[in-house]
Amino acid sequence: MLGGGDDRSTLAPAAAVLGGRLYAIGGRSGFDDFGSVYVYDPAADKWATGPSIPPRGTAGAAVHHGSIYVFGGESQSRSRTLADVYRLAPGATRWVRVGAMPTARNYARAVPYRGKIWIVGGSRFAGDSHGATGSTLVDRYVP
């Protein structure tokens, strides 16, 4: 259960670890998308809320130089995949849109490597979570 009883974002959130805390970012339930961000502190075994992000599920996330980056995802309520990139800087109280991927996609994975963040795979099609349509797309994001 996330956020002390609100477990609606447990389906398809992006996830990242920063400063010893686990971030569950966005998510969805049925055709509803959420922008909720929950932060888990394992040392205290407690959840807190973090700054909300524009609603999305199935996004990729990575940590680079102390910031969390979120890539794309899907808006089921709008039946579209997303290309935007958001950053949560250290100590920030809001997410900032910092760009867009060349190709909108969901279910892509983001990995920091050699000073860049690589976005791998994913689907270009909304509502394709149970289909077999993936991709071999690889993009690099230079923060």
Language-model segments: what does each one mean?
Residues 1-143:
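Kelch-like beta-propeller repeat domains
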